[in-house]
């Protein structure tokens, strides 16, 4: 089963509740109608049923406005993320040069340049760009094959927030 079928079978009235939203570009211009924001995920390319002249991806979802922002592959990239509920088995491991983070099960491990705690949670600055970092995903920290920490992604960081 695909994700849409699963939702339709398990969430009563989902089509009626969330139909009629719009795909928008990065400036907010309407590009066409979508089938309801719950049916899309950040980074999704297949099943959009809209043509923009080159491959388009879901870059952001606004459930309050029932909009799905579309963009291109480079717009999915970020060099950091903000986490909530971040915990480590030993805080001294947070500064290990061997520390990596994964944002998907069996996903690419990204080297961690630095971690910055503030009143909003934890900023994770990466050594390289990650794609399709989305709120709600888990970020799991490893040293080798050992899980040493984790947290929940609140948002990707913008370029001006990438400061160690």
PLM features: residue spans?
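Nucleotide-activated chemistry modules centered on ATP-dependent adenylation/adenylyltransferase
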Residues: 1-147, 151-164
